[in-house]
Amino acid sequence: VAVHGSAPGFDALADDLDGAVRLADAAHRHPGAATTLAQLLRASEGQSTEAGLLLESTAYATLQAGPEHAAWLADRGRRVRPEEAQPPVLVADEGDRFHLTLNRPRLHNMLSAAMRNALVESLRGLAAGDDRPILLDGAGRSFCAGGDPAEFGNVADPATAHLVRTSANAAPWMDRLAERLTVRVHGAAVGAGVELAAFAARVEATPDATFRLPEV
């Protein structure tokens, strides 16, 4: 960790000394996650999207098997979401374009397994169809406030979780459709919300849009 401009060979560059201290403190508190992140960023530089996603999932599975993740799960307790009546992704053919809307507005469109699967199914269908533009946005007050913490740790083991991530993932389909895709961000874009937007060739952000990666 270093202040920006002082040491280009470092893994993390902060804007000022206070930022560098905060980064160093976070790395000290979570050394496994910090080290794995640095290794992942080094290894994935210059890789294809597919290779980068595979490396990321493998790194995440490693952390899921470690003590830091176990302590986090024990500390947060278990959450249960009520069954949702509305589809997690809305799909509309608007003639000149396709319009996909993340549809969990009460939860700021936190990405659940059901939403992920619906998004993958929609994107797969659009990839097989014509080449009209695609707009992706979110219902309610936010675009996407990240993965749903109620589902974190629900998969039986890290190996199974890795297989799920690498077989049911919207990212490869968004990468394939990137030139057709516009993501419209309003309100919060956190974690997975930032990642979804990053795969689009065009991102439109409203004045109230905020972007945050809690892992960094």
Language-model segments: what does each one mean?
Residues 36, 114, 118, 166, ...:
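Charged catalytic carboxylate motif
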Residues 38-39, 141-145, 190:
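Short, active-site-adjacent cap segments at secondary-structure transitions
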Residues 71-139:
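Conserved CoA-thioester-binding segment of acyl-CoA-metabolizing enzymes
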Residues 138-172:
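Glycine- (often His-adjacent) and acidic-residue-rich active-site loop
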Residues 37, 136, 196-198:
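Hydrophobic/aromatic residues within transmembrane alpha-helices
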Residues 1-17, 170-216:
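Glycine-rich beta-to-alpha active-site loop
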